[in-house]
A protein has these predicted regions:
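C-terminal accessory module of base-excision DNA glycosylases/AP lyases that mediates lesion recognition
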Residues: 1-34, 122-123, 137-208
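Alpha-helical scaffolds flanking conserved acidic
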Residues: 11, 44-45, 81, 126
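A positional/architectural concept
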Residues: 12, 19-65, 69-72
Length: 208
């Protein structure tokens, strides 16, 4: 059975984690419930996540908003109508242009069925997405977490999560990607909720 988070399940999972983990309990008590940060499943969201690879959330959102304004409706066909210069103008790098076009072509030729992913287990969703060039662990994890609202996904290599953990624990060194995935094992089956709490801490602590 595929389980998806909603606001009610998010709160329940936060309370469960707070009982098990003092650090997450402190975040929850200090800053409250994290946002669900849900996104609509499908092509447009995957393009948005591709734009977020290795750049700030704000920078990616600016590029995505320009893209949507330019094409009005972001579909595979509409994206493929844009040339290199047009994509560069809205904020695509050469690499990301190739990734987005590859995704658009894969959707149009039936190489991937994004709707069908919604009913697959996490590991199968990741395997299907990672067949596409430019979509690796982080991109597929974020899609699972935000678009499909899966509760037990920890984005591999997410810098903000590593920084949040370093600050939360007052560590001299930031954990590596592999080290952090091992740390996250303690939060099963709610690793995606732990990630939301840590992002919430990362963003909220910067405002204090």
């Amino acid at each position: 059975m595929i389980i998806a988070l909603n606001e009610e399940k998010l709160v329940a999972a936060c309370l469960t984690l707070a009982k098990q983990d003092e650090d997450l309990a402190n975040i929850f008590q200090r800053f409250g419930k994290p946002p669900l940060w849900a996104r609509e499943p499908g092509f447009a969201t995957l393009v948005h996540i591709i734009l977020e690879q290795q750049v700030s959330v704000a920078s990616a959102k600016s590029a995505f908003d320009k893209l949507v304004k330019f094409v009005e409706i972001l579909t595979p066909k509409n994206l493929l109508r844009l040339n290199d210069a047009e994509l560069k103008a809205v904020g695509f790098s050469r690499q990301k242009t190739g990734y987005a076009r590859g995704l658009a072509e894969a959707v149009l030729n039936g190489k991937i069925d994004l709707k069908a992913l919604e009913s697959l287990p996490d590991a199968e969703v990741k395997a299907e997405l990672k067949k596409l060039k430019g979509i690796g662990d982080w991109t597929s994890d974020i899609y699972l977490l935000m678009a499909l609202s899966r509760p037990d996904v920890m984005p591999k290599g997410d810098l903000a999560l590593h920084i949040a953990w370093q600050k939360l624990k007052n560590l001299e060194l930031r954990p590596t990607s592999d080290e952090f995935l091992l740390i996250a094992e303690r939060w099963k089956p709610f690793r995606a909720v732990a990630a939301r709490l840590l992002w919430h801490f990362y963003l909220s602590a910067r405002k204090v």
